[in-house]
Amino acid sequence: MIHCGICGKAKTADVQFICCHCINGSPAVLLRDKMNLLILRQEVEQLKTAVEDQLETGFAGEGQLGRQLQKLDIYNEKRRLIKLRQRLQLARNKVQLKRNKYNELLQIMSTNGYLEESTSATDSIDLEEQAAEESASLDTLSHILARNQKQLFAELCRWFRIRKSDEDDVFSYTIWGLPMVNLKNGSELDPSIMVSSMRYLQQYLQLAFRIWLFKAICDKPIENDRNIIENFTQLIYDTLDILRARKLVSKSVSIRDILIRYDLDGMIYHLSQNKYLSSLDDASNSYPPTMQNIKQLVMSMIPSI
């Protein structure tokens, strides 16, 4: 019989046998290991909770993981939109070819009286049917493209968390939890916060241009607060550009009036909500929304610069 190495004398020196009583109750054997195990389990639970929180925050779009995943979604959706746009263009080309052929046949039939009326009528009906089918296909693709663009743009606005703040009278709107810069009170912000807010606005506008298949004139990144006038000018110009393309402002909009009424942050918010911005018109086009004119307005509306 083998004796316990703790409560009895082991017959074999190099074989350590421990009985059930000592395993369950001897502090000299397992108390320390049990304590280490409990501590390890507690640490594992804490790490598990931390990992779950990080994943939940990340997939919600508030962390680095969420931002990368959303960038990937936007990239994939952009590829789909480009392919859809190519299909749309091909359909348009087909419709145009059918129309050209139809017009050519009409011209031939009008100049050559020897063509039989029955044959001419049949060809005309066939061409009209083909043109109608191609036109219906073109309309379907246009609707699909528009629907996908609207859905993707809505996701973009939710991603950047563009909100209207009723608690702050100075900065009425926020982006990614930061105050959205404006001409009227932008100088009151800390320089680092101002630059971060401008960067978020620039990223938002760049992605919006890509979704709506427009091309921005300038992609120069905002790096610091030294070129604050140029930064404001570029952001306002891009915002006006996409607002006009989306028909959310009048084509002959007065840039002075719209900046006084809405400022940059209000224009961005209305864009995110797809709301029309009412303003006075510059019917004579005496002050067109060029970079130079916008820059002069920016300088006049920020006296501290």
Swiss-Prot record:
<dbReference type="Pfam" id="PF10186">
    <property type="entry name" value="ATG14"/>
</dbReference>
<keyword id="KW-0072">Autophagy</keyword>
<keyword id="KW-0926">Vacuole</keyword>
<dbReference type="GO" id="GO:0016236">
    <property type="term" value="P:macroautophagy"/>
</dbReference>
<dbReference type="InterPro" id="IPR018791">
    <property type="entry name" value="UV_resistance/autophagy_Atg14"/>
</dbReference>
<keyword id="KW-0813">Transport</keyword>
<keyword id="KW-0472">Membrane</keyword>
<keyword id="KW-0653">Protein transport</keyword>
<feature type="coiled-coil region">
    <location>
        <begin position="34"/>
        <end position="147"/>
    </location>
</feature>
<dbReference type="GO" id="GO:0005774">
    <property type="term" value="C:vacuolar membrane"/>
</dbReference>
<dbReference type="GO" id="GO:0032991">
    <property type="term" value="C:protein-containing complex"/>
</dbReference>
<comment type="function">
    <text>Required for cytoplasm to vacuole transport (Cvt) and autophagy as a part of the autophagy-specific VPS34 PI3-kinase complex I. This complex is essential to recruit the ATG8-phosphatidylinositol conjugate and the ATG12-ATG5 conjugate to the pre-autophagosomal structure. ATG14 mediates the specific binding of the VPS34 PI3-kinase complex I to the preautophagosomal structure (PAS).</text>
</comment>
<protein>
    <recommendedName>
        <fullName>Autophagy-related protein 14</fullName>
    </recommendedName>
</protein>
<dbReference type="GO" id="GO:0034045">
    <property type="term" value="C:phagophore assembly site membrane"/>
</dbReference>
<dbReference type="InterPro" id="IPR023261">
    <property type="entry name" value="Autophagy-related_protein_14"/>
</dbReference>
<comment type="subunit">
    <text>Component of the autophagy-specific VPS34 PI3-kinase complex I.</text>
</comment>
<keyword id="KW-0175">Coiled coil</keyword>
<comment type="similarity">
    <text>Belongs to the ATG14 family.</text>
</comment>
<dbReference type="GO" id="GO:0015031">
    <property type="term" value="P:protein transport"/>
</dbReference>
